[in-house]
């Protein structure tokens, strides 16, 4: 960030940088050892018969943003010639357990049990991003809810992989 600010001053160039929270979307990877949390969770839920295993206690809090929302922000910045630096994230946080339950409901498998692997780490308890500066510029911007975003991703996943 500091280097970019210096570059802008030194060369009198317009430059912005956007710092998003955790992203998920239709074009993520679903391969074992190469996927991110939400896509790995969707695949686990899709393949689950009775239960879904998650690492740790399920208590850590996270912000997740639908990738299409980031695309809309980028388009707005370009179309409106906005030059500044922004954190980008919905103002809500969910526990890993809540995200798992939302995923199960969104995938039509709300009756699965959650198994917590307490031999695995929770990681940092909370990771928040403050988007108030972004919202002051994009006053009417609405983030896609986690429920809606995961449903969209699951619909795309089930069509692309057709693993029924």
Named regions from a protein language model:
Residues 1-21, 37-49:
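Active-site Tyr-X1-5-Lys
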Residues 1-2, 31-39, 63-64, 93:
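Short-chain dehydrogenase/reductase
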Residues 22-26, 60-61:
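A short, flexible beta-alpha/helix-coil linker loop
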Residues 23-25, 37, 70:
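Conserved sequence/active-site signature of Rossmann-fold short-chain dehydrogenase/reductase
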Residues 26-29, 133:
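Short beta-loop-alpha junction of Rossmann-like oxidoreductase domains
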Residues 28-33, 125:
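Short, solvent-exposed loop/turn segments at secondary-structure boundaries
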Residues 47-164:
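C-terminal substrate-binding subdomain of Rossmann-fold SDR/epimerase-dehydratase oxidoreductases
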């Amino acid at each position: 960030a500091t280097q970019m600010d210096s570059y802008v001053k030194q060369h009198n160039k317009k430059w912005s940088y956007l710092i998003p929270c955790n992203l998920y979307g239709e074009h993520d990877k679903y391969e074992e050892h190469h996927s991110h949390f939400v896509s790995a969770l969707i695949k686990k839920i899709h393949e689950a018969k009775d239960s879904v295993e998650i690492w740790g206690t399920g208590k850590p809090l996270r912000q997740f943003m639908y990738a299409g929302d980031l695309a809309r922000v980028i388009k707005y910045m370009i179309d409106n010639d906005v030059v500044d630096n922004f954190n980008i994230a919905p103002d809500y946080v969910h526990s890993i357990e809540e995200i798992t339950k939302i995923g199960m409901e969104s995938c039509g498998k709300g009756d699965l049990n959650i198994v917590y692997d307490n031999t695995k780490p929770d990681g940092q308890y909370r990771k928040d991003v403050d988007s108030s500066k972004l919202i002051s510029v994009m006053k009417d911007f609405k983030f896609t809810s986690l429920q809606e975003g995961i449903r969209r991703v699951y619909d795309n996943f089930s069509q692309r992989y057709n693993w029924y």
